[in-house]
Amino acid sequence: MKVLVINCGSSSLKYQLIDMTTEDALAEGLVERIGINGSILTQKVKGREKYIVEQPLKDHQDAIELVLKSLIDGNHGVIKSMDEISAVGHRVVHGGEKYSKSVLVNDEVMKNIEECIKLAPLHNPPNIIGIKACEELMPNTPMVCVFDTAFHQTMSEKAYMYPLPYEYYTEDHIRKYGFHGTSHKYVANKVAELMKKDASELKTVTCHLGNGVSITAVDGGKSIDTTMGFTPLAGTIMGSRCGDIDPAIVTYLIKEKGYSADEVNDILNKKSGILGVSGVGTDFRDIRSAIGENNKRAILATDIFGYQIKKQIGAYAVAMGGLDTIVFTAGIGEHAPEVRIRALTGLEFIGIELDEEKNNSHDIGEGLLISKESSKVKVYVIPTNEELMIAKETLALV
């Protein structure tokens, strides 16, 4: 059985075709600049040169049509016909409170996703467009929605409620939702597999450290708390997002600096975080180079990052009443040993002993244990695979 995984952005589309018998990606690709000049598809197949197509694509339907043509192309494709695609799994950023698991697409589901647009105005609209385009082109193929927010729907009220007037929750649905759920679920299950245990036996802190950052307490295989909140702006410092700050700073910037609400939103989302503190950028390779040149602001940004992760690990160990394992994943989590060492140094008292040589290893494979054998709490680096998780969730429903 082959599952096509689709992740639609506002002007881009990522895809993978996964053979579920082996769980291998037969092809993966990216379509960029949809609806604007210079539209381009880049497809990768193991053992072959990249397949690149440049042609005008007026919308996501054009893009998906090109994806399907590329997958069945006689010279560059990996399947003979679209009939080989058993189902399509769609990443949907926000499912609100209605969805605690993945669902088959129907009219009611589409209506509910549309109602969540106000909660994810940048992400849900292109997700919806992608689903509709696939339905148009593949009317007899089952479609499944896999929600970023679903994994966190197991949080209790005390974890997800904000201490605001209660009607803001009942009328406006303002609460903590959490994001990166598919990634957190994947690595929480993967670490259990690597430890030869069931996820239900473990208390795990999963650290998804990319340009966006979220940390989750996974107790018995279920999310009980997470750092991102009503939006992906909350939590620890991120690439260009501030994370948690005193909310009064917002009103201060509006009143004292004369910024509009939109300008402040732009500052907090695009000009803050590691970029804002370091003045260097969001790419950790650039931060690493700046640290090598003794750039004090780059060092400070990395210190803040490590400190905030450490605080969160400690807080979640307390919330769960114990800790068995920590997982680092995503771009920075997988490739920045200097962040991991900052996050873990000082946590020896809760049973963490880091193996420095393993921490500096680049050979991660499907998952690398970077704590010492004697470490009570096991620490792993595990490459995330959201596409495979989406495909598994899709397969379970069709």
Swiss-Prot record:
GO CC annotation terms, alphabetical: cytoplasm
Necessary cofactors: Mg(2+); Mn(2+)
Q: Which residues bind Mg(2+)?
A: N7, E386
Record's InterPro entries? Ac/propionate_kinase, Aliphatic_acid_kin_short-chain, Aliphatic_acid_kinase_CS, ATPase_NBD
Assigned keywords, A-Z:
ATP-binding, Cytoplasm, Kinase, Magnesium, Metal-binding, Nucleotide-binding, Transferase
Principal cellular location given in the protein's record: cytoplasm
Give the UniProt subcellular location, in the record's own words: Cytoplasm
Kindly state which reaction or reactions the protein catalyses: acetate + ATP = acetyl phosphate + ADP
Indicate which residues the UniProt annotation says bind ATP: K14, H208, L209, G210, N211, G212, D283, F284, R285, G331, I332, G333, E334, H335
Q: Which GO MF terms does the UniProt record name?
A: acetate kinase activity; ATP binding; magnesium ion binding
Q: Which GO terms describe its biological process?
A: acetate metabolic process; acetyl-CoA biosynthetic process
Note the site residues: Transition state stabilizer.
Answer: H180, R241
Note accompanying the cofactor annotation: Mg(2+). Can also accept Mn(2+).
Functional pathway? Metabolic intermediate biosynthesis; acetyl-CoA biosynthesis; acetyl-CoA from acetate: step 1/2
Source species, domain of life: Bacteria
The entry's function note states: Catalyzes the formation of acetyl phosphate from acetate and ATP. Can also catalyze the reverse reaction.
Q: Which family does it belong to?
A: Belongs to the acetokinase family.
Instruction: Show the NCBIfam families listed in the entry.
Output: ackA
- Put simply, this protein is called Acetate kinase
Q: Which organism is it from?
A: Clostridium botulinum (strain Eklund 17B / Type B)
